[in-house]
Amino acid sequence: MSATYTNTITQRRKTAKVRQQQQHQWTGSDLSGESNERLHFRSRSTNSMQQHTAISNSPSPLCCNGARALTMLNCCVDVNCHLNAPLRGSVNRHTTPTPTPTATPTPVATPKQASPSPTSDRSRSLSRSPSPSRSRSLSCQKQIDKNSAGAASAEERKTANASSQPFTVNLRIDLFSWTLFLLAFGTRFYKLATPPHIVFDELHYGKYISMYMRNIFFFDQHPPLGKQLIAGLVSLAGYDGNYTFTRIGEPYSPEMPIFWFRFLPAMCGSLLAPAVYNLLLEAKLSRWSSALGGLLVVLDNSLLTQSRFVLMESMLLLATTVGIACLLRFQRSRLGSLEWFFTGTAAAVCLGAAGTVKYVGFLALGLAFYLLCRHLWQLLYDAGLTDRQLWMHAISRLLIFVGIPLAVYLGVFYIHFKTLHRAGPHDSIMTSAFQASLDGGLASITKGQPLAVVHGSQITLRHTHGRTCWLHSHAAVYPVRYPDKRGSSHQQQVTCYSFKDVNNWWLVKRPTKENLVVGDEPDIIRHGEIIQLVHGITSRALNSHDVAAAMTPQCQEVSCYIDYEIKMAGELLWRVEILNRDSEGDIWHAIKSEVRLVHVSTEASLKFSGRQLPEWGFNQHEVVADREKAIHEDAIWNVEEHRYTQTEDHRERERQMLTAEMIPTKRTRISFWAKLLELQSKMLFQTKSVPNHMYSSMPHEWPLMDKGIAYWLDSQSSAQIYLLGNILLWYTATMGILVYAGLLAFYAMRRQRLCFDISEQEWQRFVLAGDTFFMGYVMHYIPYFCVDRTLFLHNYLPAFVFKLLLLCFVVEHLDYLLRRFCTGRGVHLVRLYRLMLILWLVGVLSIFSKFIPFSYGARKMTLNEVRSLRWKDTWDFVLHKNHHLY
């Protein structure tokens, strides 16, 4: 037997030399993919420990395929290979007898004689495993002869082909994904230009897109990316932006490219189904469960309706879904690899784009940060990672998922400001400096006006931050007593008025001077100097005293002093404090200087209170004097319109104020960062709410779809577009949330008791679904309970998509539990469960088709048809012919 063993070894040495010329140097990284079962050599020998030690320390024997095998690895999948005997157990060895190793075996080769293995043993075994007929028909000796003849493995052929054709791309088509896309495309694009009328928020978004086409500045509470993309598309379709969007339901003009206006939202809605499918695959769900998720997206009526019109939700949902899918792939990629770089960049770009379409998209970015932190926390348990590698993981994620979304956001707003450089109807909401930077904006009222404020200046004082209004007074006085029985000074009212008016003009006066005419050497007002402000029309000076304000009794009343010849003397002195003098200097300048006017007698600051006066104050906004020392934004003012007094005659001054002309001139310039900060503050803190809207709803009404939204009604029939979801799908998805939460609590308690009901692999999938889908739902739903503005059902759609994803996982997990625990006769429960799923899916399809007229608005519906679809009393469908609400 020893001679036979030696002859076999000699022949294998020759084979190894041939393979050495064909293959590359083996590297240890090829061992990383080995399974745990093949990482341990379990010797079946019953010899002594000394024999085992001697064998393990001896030079590695040669495998049946001619390459040197590692001691801790079986060389191949051939059961007749003698090196596999300890792993395979008792096998039939008809071809090559297995020699029994001795305590001191004969060395089979020296390091110089043995050729290093160019690839891992597993890669060679896998290259042969796809050919079972060859492994069955050929013996181990024939396999050696075939290898010695120069036959390359499949992996080697793949490498050779890649080297010879470096610019080739292997294309793989997923039929599930393409089928879902085609189904969604057909439903979204069917009669896309119908109805040819303004539908719901197309009124607002259409206006903004038209202003983009004409470069006119507008103000919107949401970021501009979605509107920019649609504007770019319709500009290619020949739209010039001259259509006037006046009211919901108004017909579009024949020249209006309705199809191209609605194309991008519809395309994003079509891509959402395959995006959901791929996201579920990345979450380790089966293809059938993933396909179910994509199909449910196609069959939901609310997602269909929202993606057929000029609305932003479909773009938001697509960017969110693709971003999270790329993030999951990114976390499984090797640090620094090409896949790691591209998937991380794609995830960051998509999540940044989601937040730049609507602010709610930043909730998805928050979910991404949560997933990244969870993954980093898990990496801390990996003993194979050094501290340097852990820091690289953390820093690279921070740079990618902070830097790239921030760059996307800033880039979109840079384009926004560069495009919208002309003044428009929304200018007044911005500060004077911002308006002055627009073509034909505030520059129209600053032509030729002096810069420095002096004794004798005629000015309008604008509330700089927050609500747009100007310091205003009129002849009316405060009531003697307020409804709460408090008394007032009965002085002339001072308010903050939201419109341009002649009563907004004030005169700046030195307390020691009477002549208001500005001479050749103007008396410039500087920081810290004392002035009086005299109302231009009534000629009464701005005053404050220790009398409680009308609507804000904790602050002082501000008035224009009327001398009633009583003991209450006027307190008319105000100190000018320039707050931005570090950049603008100590001289009080028009437009750019931000000032606080402090009442000298009481040290109270002139402040906009934010409250509205009743009818006796003409519903204008209250102005008070606040003794709070801290600088508040509502106490900051700036001079907007400014000119010097040229005459002492009061009537002539009044005539000049009434007939002042606004002539356009060149615009001033402010930095991009100044514009961005101002616009962001307005967008975040000055959003207009629609009180008591008949179709508004509360967050607790969304999971069970208690209220919908009427988007459009045909003027001739009861055909309408009404936002409703697939009620069976919505209710089932809500139950899925409860089922997952219950299972999570159950598993957590059982695992605490060291009872492991499911496999570790399934538990990891369960946790991943919770981290991604359950947390995604919570993070997109709970914040709305803290929002103080009018909300609608479509605000729930991002959370609904995550709820849909979680439902797909729950469906698959329940199937797993039934297959695991219902064995034997219980297998009928698995079949029954799957039959119920099919029936449920048929029900979802049936409800989708029944309510589809509300998504398209193309079919005229009778009164009875509309009534038959009112399944809940809270659904307020709109009816024609004197039936406004049912």
Swiss-Prot record:
EC numbers on record: 2.4.1.109
Keyword vocabulary terms for this entry: Developmental protein, Endoplasmic reticulum, Glycoprotein, Glycosyltransferase, Membrane, Repeat, Transferase, Transmembrane, Transmembrane helix
Domain MIR: 450-511, 522-579, 585-642
Residues annotated as transmembrane: 256-276, 310-330, 349-369, 398-418, 727-747, 791-811, 835-855
Sugar-modified residues: N161, N242
Stretches with biased composition (Low complexity): 105-139
Enzyme class: transferase
MF terms in GO: dolichyl-phosphate-mannose-protein mannosyltransferase activity
Annotated catalysed reactions: a di-trans,poly-cis-dolichyl beta-D-mannosyl phosphate + L-seryl-[protein] = 3-O-(alpha-D-mannosyl)-L-seryl-[protein] + a di-trans,poly-cis-dolichyl phosphate + H(+); a di-trans,poly-cis-dolichyl beta-D-mannosyl phosphate + L-threonyl-[protein] = 3-O-(alpha-D-mannosyl)-L-threonyl-[protein] + a di-trans,poly-cis-dolichyl phosphate + H(+)
Topology within the bilayer: Multi-pass membrane protein
Cellular compartments annotated: Endoplasmic reticulum membrane
Biochemical pathway: Protein modification; protein glycosylation
Main function: Rt/POMT1 and tw/POMT2 function as a protein O-mannosyltransferase in association with each other to generate and maintain normal muscle development.
Family: Belongs to the glycosyltransferase 39 family.
Subunit structure as annotated in this protein's UniProt entry: Interacts with tw/POMT2.
Full protein name: Protein O-mannosyltransferase 1
Organism field: Drosophila melanogaster
Taxonomic lineage from the root: Eukaryota, Metazoa, Ecdysozoa, Arthropoda, Hexapoda
